[in-house]
Amino acid sequence: YHACYLGDLVIHSLYPQWEPKFGINGGILPEDVEKLLKDYPKTQAVLITSPTYDGAVSDVKRIAEICHAHGISLIVDEAHGAHLGFCPYFPESALKLGADVVIQSFHKTLPSFTQTAVLHVSKSARVDEDRIRRFLGIYQSSSPSYIFMAAMDRCVEFLKNEGKERFEAFAARLEDFYAFIRGLERIRIPGYEIRGDYGIFDFDRSKILLVPDAHGGEWLAEELRKKDHLELEMAAGGYGLALTSVMDTEEGFERLRKALNRIDGELADEEAACVGRVGAGVESALDRRSRSVGYDGVVHNEIVVSLRGAYDGEKETVPLKESEGRISGEFLYLYPPGIPLLMPGERISRDVLGRVAFFQGEGLSIQGLRDYRAEFIDVLKKGR
């Protein structure tokens, strides 16, 4: 989004599919990419995220073929996939599937310091590598951290010398964990079975999605934090996300297994206690979300003004609850992962406001707005 602002780029959005069973975003359909490129033939590049924060992997190979057939490049945000390609247990890296440029964050899934990342350029990339170098020189610091660079070198050496053995052990621990969770009754954890639908071409099982039959992600995160001293990567409306890596130990997996076993039993007891009560029942966060105002899958926002035009335009502040129909002058998102529910230049819909109300009701923090309480939002003075 910073690049779109700086370059005053025209954005055409590609939306992922919606996986309703577990309440997550799926992948990008190749046919949606094809349609977008036909509708907007002046498109210069396509950017997708794969894998997603939740582990959904799009059909990168087919999407790359479509982009190349139209004479443009494919850029893949593979920030949460730096570990891909080192073991057949995990999906293949986008770089080997035809993507022209791939960005990976070492620190997210490999042993390296925060802020260490790499930009890969394919040998057959349809990009000007010299221009990439030039702009990296403009935007990167002229005083890089030697600690960070040394950490990245150490990470590469680790992968060369110990990678095969470590990743095989990691895959075995994950396989044991997924075998264990088949015995849980009140916590659902998706695996390979979600492949093939909703744009999910493949699935990265190092991302463990925990979907309780009752309560929501914030409740689950609090349970694990207070009673088991385990911290989830993210608490979403209907699920929690546990990220694992090649550095996780058997002891860590065992602690998670014991904690989930305890919670699963408590949820079963809670459900049993409700049986027989008039009008009683345990409603899951997914059920609550499905009946929330305007909540039905992925939100499709209307882009009215360019990102730069909205950022720099004259604005006024209005109550968020009364902003339907106005053009946003701010980002609005949940963090993590920081994917916008709304960005500057988009029209504020009832759908978005319904989601915000649901997330706030689940105890999740809305971020991005100048008003940190998320009660007011800056909108363009002109334009409805």
Question: What are the residue ranges of the model-derived segments?
Answer:
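Terminal helix/beta-alpha structural elements that buttress the NAD(P)+-binding lobe
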Residues: 369-383
